[in-house]
Amino acid sequence: MNTFVLRLVYVHSQVRWYTVHFTGSERTEYADFLARMGMETDPKHQRDLNDVKAAIQTIGNKYGAHLRYFRDEQDIAHRGKAMAVPSTLVMRSQLRLYCHVLSTKVVILFNGNFKTKGPISAQDCLRVEPHFTKANQLTRIIDQALEDGEHLHWDNTRTVLVYDQNKPINP
């Protein structure tokens, strides 16, 4: 996995949303997700994408990033904390956008795809597994970077991530 920096995506009244930008990549992870999902021609898939974007806005402006608003697909066995936006409380969709909820005020958006229908886990779905695995790896790296405090740390209020965009985080 390449080094990366965080990029601020949205600042809402309740939540700051960040994403990952890998060194050498043209797009951030979230921008790649939006571009790929935006190319879907199925009207239901377009509705699902719009619903995910609306959920981010609603969570960000109205509720805060409480865990009940995220789909718990955490892979505890592999020590990752990736979750998906949004939970079944907000919408029932096969679209998964993986993220790392650091607090009720800070979320890092990753990437995702449409999960295969049926009782199949994210770990076993060929479409979302690569995104889910990468998201879990990133949660561990980000948690470690926060713990180390060298390239990434909280501000005094624990509502803003402080980092230098010229100093990538090393996996």
Map each language-model feature to its residues.
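Short acidic loop-to-beta-strand element that houses the catalytic metal-binding Asp/Glu
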Residues: 94-99
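Active-site beta-strand-loop-beta-strand hairpin of nuclease catalytic cores
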Residues: 100-109
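Basic, Lys/Arg-enriched alpha-helical interface segments
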Residues: 1-93, 116-171
